[in-house]
């Protein structure tokens, strides 16, 4: 809701946001919904859009990793994720915020590559354990990620650094900066420590 309120103040009812909210209002009239329908439906649309892009791009990244290797695709996708967070830092308009989410969703489809890498390095007997560890990692991310993001959102860089407003700094830029930091750490670790798990010989040329 806070993100929606912010971009309503910035963009008003014009542009992409106005078009979306206009259709949401029409839907609300038909459904007879009560207060806060805008925020609830808006959040659902953003979350669904991100998940749909993950779903679409997961097989694409997985197929590409079969040809050029897991490490290369992970470097590409984590770089793309970092880019999406950088755009979020400077999302002074709703359109740029949506673009950041679209890019993030597309590159977040690398889950298939990560699980494939685990499958590459585990035996048949230990594969379930390896996949379980992946699940634990995701669970920890879902547990601590929102908590850290909510804490970071209390630091409004647009108020603390008003001279950066022209660059698109917004009330949620601090959370985006934190996300960039974790993403860069991930990227550096992959580049420095992650060894290719898919041997050259069995790779699919097609």
Predicted regions and their residues:
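Loop-to-transmembrane helix entry
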Residues: 12-49
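Central cavity-lining transmembrane alpha-helices of secondary-active solute carriers
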Residues: 43-61
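Small-residue-rich transmembrane alpha-helices and their cytosolic helix-loop interfaces
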Residues: 47, 51, 78, 131-139
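Conserved MFS/SLC helix-loop-helix module at the cytosolic interface between two early adjacent transmembrane helices
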Residues: 55-94
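MFS 12-TM fold signature
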Residues: 78-85, 104, 182-186
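Cytoplasmic helix-loop-helix junction between adjacent transmembrane helices
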Residues: 100-138
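Glycine-rich segments within core transmembrane alpha-helices of 12-TM secondary carriers
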Residues: 131-154
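C-terminal membrane-cytosol helix-exit motif in multi-pass small-molecule transporters
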Residues: 180-200
């Amino acid at each position: 809701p806070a993100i929606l309120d912010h971009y309503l103040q910035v963009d008003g009812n014009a542009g992409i946001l106005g078009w979306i909210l206009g259709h949401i209002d029409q839907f609300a009239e038909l459904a007879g919904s009560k207060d806060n329908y805008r925020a609830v439906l808006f959040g659902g649309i953003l979350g669904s859009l991100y998940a749909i892009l993950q779903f679409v791009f997961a097989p694409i990244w997985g197929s590409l990793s079969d040809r050029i290797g897991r490490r290369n695709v992970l470097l590409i996708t984590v770089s793309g994720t970092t880019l999406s967070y950088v755009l979020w830092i400077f999302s002074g308009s709703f359109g740029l915020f949506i673009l950041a989410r679209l890019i993030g969703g597309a590159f977040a489809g690398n889950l298939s590559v990560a699980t494939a890498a685990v499958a590459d390095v585990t035996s048949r007997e230990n594969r379930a354990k390896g996949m379980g560890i992946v699940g634990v990692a995701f669970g920890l991310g879902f547990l601590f990620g929102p908590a850290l993001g909510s804490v970071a959102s209390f630091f409004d860089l647009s108020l603390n650094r008003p001279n950066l407003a022209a660059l698109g700094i917004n009330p949620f830029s601090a959370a985006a900066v934190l996300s960039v930091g974790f993403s860069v750490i991930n990227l550096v670790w992959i580049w420095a420590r992650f060894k290719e798990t898919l041997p050259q010989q069995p790779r699919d040329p097609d």
